[in-house]
Amino acid sequence: IYLLCLVILGIPALVLEFSIGRAAQTSPLFMYRKLEKPGQKWGIFGWFCLLGNIALMAFYTVVCGWIIYYFVQFLRGKNGSLGFSAMISSPSVNVFFLLVTVVIAFFILSFNLQGGLERVTKYMMSALLVLMLALAVHSLFLKGSGEGMTFYLKPDFSKIDGSVIVGAMNQAFFTLSTGMGGMAIFGSYIGKEHSLMGEAIHVITLDTLVAFLAGVIIFP
């Protein structure tokens, strides 16, 4: 169901957002205003994009802070217990690593999208994919991995109901980050020589591959 939602809903949504970004060539706050005709009020949706991105930033900066915290703990050799409850109950730890995340993000973005974010993510995403492949292979050799993979991949059609379908739809839109203007930003950097449909298919294929590998890592 999730894969069907990606194909039926995800591809059109991505192509739409890519096309808006490529046509407007500006930030999500102003892209609707730039493309609207006189008398139309589509520009108000730019403010929804801004508020949505602020909400996402409030969420992801905290999670990134947790990742940096665990990386520091790993370097210190403290691998016996994750201590998640103790970590999230400490305001000083959370605020400190949140600030570290914000400082790192501002430093990277100071070099603009192509000179900063694109250059960094090119190496980080490649390293993450290699790491996930290694962890997935390791998980397949764990005891009981066969039962875990059966639970992960064997469908149970008796569990399908309205809430499952809605959940699959929500996950499809969430995992593709559509509706907040983020994909429109990337669309503004897609040249006319590239097919928006092809770019959308590439994004969905890689996103699905990463999601599948994450499941292989977790369930066994």
Please state what every model-predicted region is.
Residues 1-2, 41-48, 81-82, 194-203:
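Membrane-interface alpha-helices at helix entry/exit sites of multi-pass transporters
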Residues 23-48, 61-116, 143-167:
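Inter-helical loop and helix-membrane interface segments of multi-pass membrane transporters/permeases
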Residues 3-8, 48-59, 100-107, 120, ...:
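Hydrophobic alpha-helical transmembrane segments of multi-pass membrane proteins
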Residues 118, 122-220:
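Membrane-embedded translocation segments of transport machinery
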